[in-house]
Amino acid sequence: GVPEPKPLFEIWVYSPRVEGVHLRGGKVARGGLRWSDRREDFRTEILGLVKAQQVKNTVIVPVGSKGGFVLKNAPPASDRDAYMAEGIACYKLFLSGLLDVTDNVVKGSVVPPADVVRHDVDDPYLVVAADKGTATFSDIANGVSADYGFWLGDAFASGGSVGYDHKKMGITARGAWEAVKRHFRTLGVNTQTTPFTVAGIGDMSGDVFGNGMLLSEHIQLVVAFDHRHIFIDPTPDVARSFAERQRLFNLPRSSWDDYDKSLISKGGGVYPRSAKSIALSPEARAVIGITAEELPPLELLKAILQAPVDLLYNGGIGTYVKASFETHAQVGDKASDAFRVNGSELRCKVVAEGGNLGCTQNGRIEYAQKGGLIYTDAIDNSAGVDCSDHEVNIKILLGGVVEAGDLTLKQRNDLLASMTDEVGHLVLQDNYYQTQALDIATHRPLYVLDGQQRLMQWLEGSKRLNRAIEFLP
């Protein structure tokens, strides 16, 4: 009775302080580790993420993996330092649990872990990456890897201090922006020269949202929300709002409440999601496309998701769009149940999925069938894992050279740093071409459907595809 998709390998880590799971689709797999807050159903969350990761990793050699852990005795979140300290300690425990049962490579030979009864074949490839809650933990993970003498060294967790910093590079958002630009080219709009309206999910301190909202100087961010605030700016001054978003991005731990209120256009403002209700000006009502003069925050969030804007840009955590025939329980994200909308209710022209699992697949299909332009999270935000894979492969390649004494660690690090721009270019090239391939496939004549049908049947017959899971015909 295990729900599909069934991973090829699963490691479950259990202790009085932490519980976690790591799912892999194959022997060579990669994906991030999430600090989950879903104590009751974190495996469901990780399973959904690994499903998206499997598709996302089509652009690289490793198949998808995903891990997640929950704290069992967490201090109150209000005590930030104690909460973070417990999170880091539990993260280390979780990683130790994974490495305790993972084979190592010593001088070219696979060495099974001590005190483990092993029934499987050699299986030493285990790499991890940052995800929600663990964005700054790569060095910690590589420290655990070093303690274990693990063969991958600092290639175990990509994106550390000696690696490609995704937020600094803005690589995930830049990859998603390739999808945005292509969608708008379909509409005859150049996002880099023409103003366009945006509704956003996230805030400027985040990697994917913060970097994304700085990728065009012509963004008119009219509404946005995160887990704390709702931001409304009905008629933003493009240049001044861009500069203010840049300031917030550079401000450590900023929130929408830090936005300079004097720069917000008439009828706008920043409102706490904890308010009982929010009064809406005529200007705010016009840009959101509603008539109600006052709404509770959750109803307002629902209205924002349905706003008649050019672009809905998701840089947040959660599933906000489903199909009309799906129930909230089927979606598996209780935190967003109260304001989730149907794909048929979206009024934006384009959806960009910088965040994972923002829509269910049926929700995407329903939105696309009514004329909306959307790819999937696996397409839009694949640049992050693509960049990590480049880093790990370069480190593995150079590891042997360093070990042989033909390259010092400092020389290796300098070489890695010097390749940053080139790696970024190669990754974005993948984003450009995979969206191009999808658009070409979409515009092919109907008579090629027979070939696509045969391809799907062949993929399914060779166990590379499950049409039911992917909601394919």
Feature names for model-found ranges:
Residues 1-129, 138-141, 154-161:
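Extended, well-ordered protein cores
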Residues 77-78, 87-88, 99-121, 134-473:
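Non-transmembrane, aqueous-exposed alpha-helical and coiled segments at domain scale
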